[in-house]
Amino acid sequence: MREVTIAAIQMSCSRDVKENIEKAAKLIRAAAEAGAQIILPSELFERQYFCQERRYEYYAYAKSVQENDAVQHFTQTAKELGVVIIVSFYEKNINVLYNTVTV
């Protein structure tokens, strides 16, 4: 049987998307260096968690998979490190919003 090491990352997030992506990147790299092959950052880690309530202003956070900075960044990071990174993001597809996971 093959052994697989999985890392789950729980981190505090700020309102600064770029800062949160950079923080997650450091933690993902540390997990990969420690031997993790599958890495799962916190749910919707790009921002402070906002899903407790439905507010119109949150709809602006949603982006398509192609426009999402975290998805694009961690697609490249996964290739570079040779690991699987599971990224949760708020997706907009036409006029429908999803809490999506991409691998």
Model-derived features with residue positions:
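A generic structural signal for ordered alpha-helices
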Residues: 2, 9, 52-56
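Active-site-proximal beta-strand elements of phosphoester/diester hydrolases
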Residues: 3-15, 100
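N-terminal phosphate-binding loop and adjacent alpha-helix
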Residues: 10-27
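Cys-nucleophile CN-hydrolase/nitrilase-fold catalytic domain and related Cys-dependent amidase chemistry
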Residues: 17, 29-103
